[in-house]
A protein has these predicted regions:
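Active-site-proximal, well-structured secondary-structure segments within enzyme catalytic domains
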Residues: 35
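His/Cys-centered metal/cofactor-coordination and adjacent catalytic loops
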Residues: 39-40
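Intrinsic disorder at enzyme termini
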Residues: 1-13
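Internal helix-loop-helix
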Residues: 49-111, 115-120, 161-163
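N-terminal glycine-rich anion-binding loops that anchor highly charged ligand groups
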Residues: 16-21, 45-50
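Glycine-rich, Trp-frequent "lid" loop and neighboring beta-strands that shape
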Residues: 62-66, 108-164
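N-terminal capping segment at the start of a domain
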Residues: 22-31
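Residue-level signal for inorganic ion chemistry
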Residues: 11, 22, 106, 155
């Protein structure tokens, strides 16, 4: 059974623009990035300058304000996949981790971090996989102790996605 998503002309324009961006800013460098196991920070900044980071973020924080329209995220995933760009985790920063700040952060934290994420200045990562527990967050062994003005984090990780 074929399923069709309800794309509109705005989505088609976005797809064309994002695909052209990838062809210029990612495809020519992708093999080198994979070899080095790192996507350079400049790529995220270019994504931000082009308006492709964290599209859901409210306009008051510098975002496009496309909250609730998940089809833009679908298009980004399809365009990355279409080009075989499987080790670029830009969606992790803007679409997976940043919503935690938007939903659970204070207004001060939103004002500080969301504009930087939208611009690609700040890249968020995830480090949850541990040697003896995999990605089972219920059994995570890492600890974080509130030291007053900072947290002391102690633990061993196997992977850090978007670690730079």
């Amino acid at each position: 059974m074929e399923r069709k998503l309800p794309f509109k002309w705005e989505h088609d324009e976005f797809r064309e623009a994002f695909g052209a961006f990838l062809d210029k800013e990612a495809v020519p460098y992708y093999d080198e990035w994979c070899k080095n196991h790192m996507v350079p920070h400049e790529y995220f900044e270019k994504m931000g300058q082009a308006g492709f980071m964290a599209l859901w973020v409210d306009k008051k924080y510098g975002g496009a304000g496309r909250n609730g329209d998940f089809l833009y995220t679908v298009i980004k995933a399809e365009e990355y996949s279409k080009r075989g760009l499987n080790c670029i985790f830009s969606r992790l920063s803007g679409d997976v981790v940043a919503p935690y700040i938007a939903e659970n952060g204070t207004e001060e934290q939103r004002e500080k971090w969301l504009p930087r994420i939208v611009k690609g200045e700040t890249v968020l990562g995830v480090c949850m996989t541990e040697p003896d527990h995999g990605s089972d967050l219920a059994n995570i062994q890492a600890s974080a102790v509130d030291m007053g003005d900072h947290f002391l984090v102690n633990g061993t990780k196997t992977f850090i996605s978007n670690g730079m």
